Amino acid sequence: MKYPKEYLDEIKTRLKVSTVVSKSVSLKKRGKEFVGLSPFKTEKTPSFTVNDEKEFYHCFATSEHGNIFDFVMKTQNLKFGEAVKSLENLAG
């Protein structure tokens, strides 16, 4: 199913990337970003960053990056439509 850009933007407006990511990754605020251990790789030193202002995450250990939809698809093994529904429920 194709979703209108306005609808996806509304979900992104209601949910900060850090809010979505922090449900599965422990994040600490560092300046304008949040940092934490990568959900994509076992590590001891945090290499995973989240930037709410730019609406994306990036893992320096694996080069994974994207927005809230990408994160939910990758970490929960969902298709795009399923990720939208999951975030839709979270956004209320």
Where are these regions (language model features)?
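N-terminal structured subdomain of primase-like DNA metabolism proteins
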Residues: M1-G92
